[in-house]
Amino acid sequence: MISATNEHQELSTLWGQSLQPVHCLNCKVAHLIPGNLESTHCPACFSGRLERQPSVIRREPPELMVNFTISPEQVEMHFKDWVKGIWFRPKELDPNLLSRRVNRAFIPLWLVDGKITGTWQAQMGYDYEVASSQEAYQNGTWRTRKVTETRIRWEARTGTIERRYQNLVVPALEEHAWLITGLGKYKLNLATSYSPLQMDNASIRVPSLLPESAWPLAKSKFDQYSAKDCQMAAEAQHVDEFIIQAAYEDQNWTQLLLPMYTTAYRDEDGIVHTILINGQNGNIFGKKLASQRKARILSLGLLGTALLCFIFGLLFAVGTKFLPILGLLSLTSFILALLVGISAPMPAIWAWNFNRSQD
């Protein structure tokens, strides 16, 4: 068994900085956090407490990283744009407060190297042109127009392949597709060699999709690249029904880190909502909810105003017996009561519909 001290030393050697493995008691997500970081709150859910996790830590090293290009100051500007149009915001859904709570974090991808050796068969498609004539009746006469059509000639091909591929990108988190859908794609071509100097107290998500589980995705990538290489070797323009029987050897798994900010706010019911920000392009991913309580208070206020106008209208109507000019005030009060009464439920309805659109 590896002791916690030895594991801590191994992590420090692997990552070039002092790190400690932790996991969240609430969301069960595992992280590597800087040894000097005193926060006990989970950077993933902001609800759970972090506890040390001295074992079951992946030892695949970091190889590449995409650096942060969005500063915390720019994050606040992105938040200001993000919350525009929300009329009734919860107290904590404030750009300044959200930006002050941001944590730097990195999410992992697998980089897979390996050698593929085997045999393949496929239908290779070759473009060729067919010339024909097309008759058209124009301006009282028949005209002939030449038409060139591109068609595909399919040929069965077989062969062998022996290739080595490097840095095939494979998800390392079970929720990777969900995260990228919300955060937007990263420009992986801007990745640089891993440097602990660029981490700056950032937490690191521990892969939840282990190499054994991620292998089918990696194998698919190997096969895709093999199909492209076989297509190029056959000088074909198209490939279909590609089947390969191969051995996948000399595999090496490392990590590519993607930058992300995390923050959170509590809604009026005390529920914590985590907000994620793409550290490269500033895309914001999370729920922005309106305060239904504030909306209901405004609706009740408008309803009370409408009722008050109606009461004044009645009083003015009674007063017309003594002062006819009060009839005009009575009519005005009734019209105001009607207009305000119609608009009274609008704030509550808007907040309800807005929150439904965030699901």
Predicted feature descriptions by range:
Residues 24-27, 42-45:
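Short cysteine-rich clusters marking metal-coordination/redox-active sites
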Residues 16, 58-271, 290-297, 305, ...:
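Charged, low-complexity helical/coil segments in non-catalytic cytosolic or luminal regions
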Residues 33-34, 51-52:
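Short, non-ligating residues that shape and space the ligands of small metal-coordination modules
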Residues 1-14, 32:
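N-terminal cysteine/histidine-rich coordination modules
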Residues 40-43, 57:
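Conserved glycine-bearing catalytic or ligand-binding loops at nucleotide- and phosphate-handling centers
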Residues 10-11, 30, 97-102:
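Catalytic micro-motifs at enzyme active sites that drive phosphoryl/nucleotidyl and oxygen chemistry
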Residues 17-21, 39:
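Residues immediately within or flanking Cys/His clusters that coordinate Zn2+
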Residues 270-291:
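Juxtamembrane amphipathic/hinge helix adjacent to a transmembrane helix
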